[in-house]
Amino acid sequence: MKAWQFTKTHKPLELIDYPEPKAGKGEVVVDIKASGLCHTDVTILDDPGWMQLIKAPVILGHEYAGVIDSVGEEVTDFKVGDRVGICPIDPDTGTSIGGMVDGAYANKMVVPATEAIHLPDNVTFLQGAAATDAGMTSHHA
């Protein structure tokens, strides 16, 4: 599979071959249908000060939505084919997707099932991707 990798400020993202993700215990693999580019991503690309806040190389992208591709053991809230949005920060660890761990500028990614939320059928993947970050921001304001 392919993914866009960030390596250094003021360098373009690099399209790389990336291992196909596999769901472990408590995890889901998401087939990404939409992924946003937000101010954080642009700042990471342009501001060297952000290098201390992320692990590079890293796959950027923390605003995304998609379809469950596979589920790991002990996942009961989701099944293959479910439409989901993903919380950009792990509520249990505070780890940020697309900064501290690889993000959604890829075909698929694996995340803890606790980070996924069901996306209603009347919400597009584009709307769902934008809402994951903006919704979290307004929720915590």
Residue ranges and their predicted role:
Residues 87-141:
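NAD(P)H dinucleotide-binding glycine-rich loop of Rossmann-like/cofactor-binding domains
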Residues 14-15, 51-54, 92-98:
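A short, acidic/glycine-rich surface segment
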Residues 1-2:
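Extreme N-terminal starter segment of soluble prokaryotic enzymes
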Residues 40-46:
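Cytochrome P450 core scaffold surrounding the K-helix E-X-X-R motif
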Residues 39, 62, 140:
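Histidine-centered active-site/metal-ligand motif
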Residues 10-15, 39-40:
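Short N-terminal binding/cap micro-motifs at the start of the first secondary-structure element
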Residues 19-35, 48-90, 120-123:
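Glycine-rich beta-strand-centered segment in the early N-terminal region that forms part
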Residues 5, 15-17, 65-67, 108-110, ...:
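Conserved hydrophobic/aromatic beta-strand scaffold that supports enzyme active sites
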